[in-house]
Amino acid sequence: MGRSRYHNKLKEGIFEAEITALSHDGRGIAKVDGKTTFIPFTLPGEVVKFEYTFTKAKFDEAKVVEYVKKSLNRVNPPCDHFQICGGCSLQHMSTDAQIEHKQQTLINQLKYIGNGVEPENILPPLRTSNTEGYRNKARLGVRYVSKKGKILVGFRERNGRFLADIDKCIVLNPLVGDKITEISSFIETLSIYQHIAQLEIAIDDTRPAMIVRHLEPFTNEDLEKLRSFAQENNYWIYLQSKGPDTIFRLYPQGDVEPKKLSYQPAAGIDIGFEPNDFTQVNNDINKKMIKRAIELLDISENDSIIDLFCGLGNFTLPISQHAKTVIGVEGEPTMVKRAKETADNNNITNVNFYAANLFESFEDKEWFNNFEYNKMLLDPPRAGAQEVCNNIEKFNVKRIVYVSCDTAALARDAGILVNTKGYKLISAGVMDMFPHTMHVESIAVFEKI
């Protein structure tokens, strides 16, 4: 029997609709004859004329032909590549409106995904001092395009299939973002330019580092060119031929100081990191976020605090300046090792770090059984902290500060804490970690009733 496939004929002509909301990827949403239609580069409240570009059983896609009514929140995108490059999704929306939208997204998801959870107070949003040049971490694709006769370096196009042809990136730190053309031209001089797949960028307080992911070996001449490029631009260059364990630093060579990249999360603390380690992309907001987390924990000198999903100690080490003891727990052993080294290098003696998978049972772990805590900080990845929240009564903590990069996961976990574990949501708010994108960084405070 042959397979039957659903085929819908694309509607022809020009249609009109009002945009009522934004999708998770920043496209405008309109309801046309009861069916959801996604229309890019539109904002809620706008009325547009459009034509269909794609249709499926449950939704349609379209493009704007004319703006009949424009939103007061509409601005001219600061980047010439905005409509092509997929790196940003909200440059056509004022930064104030972006924050308001993200704040409302948080409140809505707490209510609907968290089954009625509402914060007693809305925290004022943490704003960044610069919505351009803020991004210090990125993975940039590299591809030789024969039709264009050149190397492309950048993010994928909005459709996700090809790399966008860009000459600069305004959200990347300008030490890299202003040099996209220079970097792509340099790669063209290498013998294996068609076999370089990716550049992983990490920028500390003073210098950029670049991991060059290559699929074929470099020649000696290539290596000399890479060293010269690094020296001329004050870059640290790393090479990666296969998995993460193959990464090594090509330039500078030898036992140089400093041995690692580093940043200061708070006064008096230097955290060393490798370019493939997880660090926050926005240094300005990171410092403000840490300060806010410490304020919301309401730390006294007798507090014992546990920091789960602690990474390199981004929160743990600054918290240690205010608390009696702090324990950091992280799933990646390499990061735990670096966190311990950082504590030693900064002469911090009231912290300790442990490696543990926090997505499975941890009741047999030393850090769980041999210490008592009265407060907790959570900073999980996008998956959230469901296992921890399901077992929160075993920690017996009075206050929880939860930092989240995924509002849906936070809302789910808030529902667990508030509806089944006897906590109340004191306050919640957003932080402008990712301007011009739909990514939402948020923070919430829970207190035991």
From Swiss-Prot:
Keyword Methyltransferase set for record: yes
Record bears the keyword Glycoprotein: no
One Pfam family recorded for the sequence: TRAM
Enzyme active site: C405
TRAM domain ranges (all copies): 1-66
UniProt-annotated binding residues for [4Fe-4S] cluster: C79, C85, C88, C169
Keywords noted in UniProt: 4Fe-4S, Iron, Iron-sulfur, Metal-binding, Methyltransferase, rRNA processing, S-adenosyl-L-methionine, Transferase
CDD domains linked: AdoMet_MTases (cd02440)
Any one GO MF annotation of this record: rRNA (uridine-C5-)-methyltransferase activity
PANTHER family, per database record: 23S RRNA (URACIL(1939)-C(5))-METHYLTRANSFERASE RLMD, RNA M5U METHYLTRANSFERASE
Record's function text: Catalyzes the formation of 5-methyl-uridine at position 1939 (m5U1939) in 23S rRNA.
Family, per entry: Belongs to the class I-like SAM-binding methyltransferase superfamily. RNA M5U methyltransferase family. RlmD subfamily.
Protein name, UniProt field: 23S rRNA (uracil(1939)-C(5))-methyltransferase RlmD
Lineage summary: Bacteria, Pseudomonadati, Pseudomonadota, Gammaproteobacteria, Thiotrichales
Name of the coding gene: rlmD
